Amino acid sequence: MIGMRRLISSGSSFEREIGYSRAVVDGDWVFVSGTTGFDYEAMTISDNVIEQAEQCLRNIEMALAQAGSRWADVVRVRYILPRVEDFEPCWPVLRRYFGDVRPAATMIAAGLSDPRMKIEIEVTAKVHVEL
């Protein structure tokens, strides 16, 4: 796997317009871009931060699967939210995905590129290897 670089797309128009990949597999690492709660097929987004968090994680899960990775392989997660007070309501959803994995984590308060976006999640993982 060393030396191989593979680009993963979600089909989002944002990827074409901005010039990035949903994820990049480089060697045995998977780097998933900051992912928002857009449903990329419908290009819609909920106004509810908890629903957005759930959709973010579904979008990330698809990218991880295409990369040959899974939740147990995630080593780092970054959460970016414009409103700090929106983070705690998301904890039950985040715990469902990361509770047993317990990756290194950071939460950052910052503006996002679209005012409808309430949370963005980025992960780094290893390519899954069966032992």
Task: Describe the function of each predicted region.
Residues 2-131:
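Short, polar/acidic, helix-capping and beta-turn segments at strand->helix junctions
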